A protein has these predicted regions:
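Acidic, serine/threonine- and proline-rich low-complexity intrinsically disordered segments
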Residues: 1-209, 217-220, 227
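Short, intrinsically disordered, charge-balanced linker/junction segments flanking boundaries
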Residues: 209, 213, 232-235
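C-terminal tails and terminal domains of large nucleic-acid-associated
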Residues: 221-236
């Protein structure tokens, strides 16, 4: 539109309002894309029957116990985040702007959501279990000489597991978290053998992390981060 002889550009997008969606104008295509993806996701969550209750009923007792100790405030919030991760895995970079495009996505999500949620919840249960193992390993290392590397290990753990980590990490990268957590446990177990070696490695990682944050990255990742930032984060 034009105002006072100037051209004003605005980019419309669906906006996630929690229990509903609205339309809002944004100043940049990037902000538009981030908001629109979240808005489409919310519409999809409202448009498909949720299999959450069914999946919860079929969890093993062990899975229920592990999931109850997640970093999320409630198990319901954890399952909501798992649903979002499952939907994002189907939607990908698609940006539906018409009813037909949205209905195509809705049908694709509906066709896979039950199996996808089962798989995601089972994986998240493994991840949380390994996170507990990592926490125990860190707590069990009590040498005063290891305070700095143990604090670094704690920081790494908290950058992997936090409220919202499932959807922000995404279904594809979630599969790598057990490997990262195993590596963290191995690091803590081996700290006492050669703390000098660990300090060298820690300094190298810190230097890379500093460059990452200077370029706009954050630990943990923030929702809506640019693709280049996401790629760089998982290179650390």
């Amino acid at each position: 539109t034009r105002h006072g002889g100037n051209t004003i550009r605005a980019y419309p997008a669906l906006v996630d309002k929690g229990s509903s969606v609205s339309i809002r104008l944004f100043g940049t295509p990037h902000d538009q894309a981030v908001a629109h993806r979240a808005g489409v996701r919310r519409l999809l969550l409202k448009a498909i029957p949720s299999p959450t209750g069914y999946v919860q009923e079929h969890l093993t007792t062990q899975e229920k116990l592990v999931l109850a100790q997640s970093p999320y405030r409630t198990t319901a919030e954890l399952f909501d985040d798992c649903m979002i991760a499952c939907i994002d895995a189907v939607v990908g970079d698609a940006e539906p702007w018409t009813r037909a495009e949205f209905e195509t996505l809705r049908d694709a999500v509906s066709a896979t959501i039950v199996d996808s949620l089962f798989e995601t919840v089972a994986l998240v249960s493994r991840i949380i279990g390994k996170g507990r193992d990592a926490d125990r390993a860190i707590r069990g290392a009590t040498s005063m000489a290891l305070i700095s590397p143990l604090a670094d290990a704690r920081s790494q753990l908290e950058a992997l597991l936090y409220p919202g980590f499932v959807a922000i990490t995404g279904a594809r990268q979630l599969r790598r978290l057990p490997v990262y957590l195993d590596g963290l446990i191995h690091r803590v177990d081996k700290l006492a053998e050669n703390p000098s070696r660990d300090r060298v490695w820690m300094a190298e990682v810190q230097a890379a992390s500093d460059r990452y944050t200077a370029a706009g990255g954050s630990l943990p990742l923030q929702a809506g981060a640019e693709a280049r930032v996401i790629h760089a984060r998982w290179m650390l």
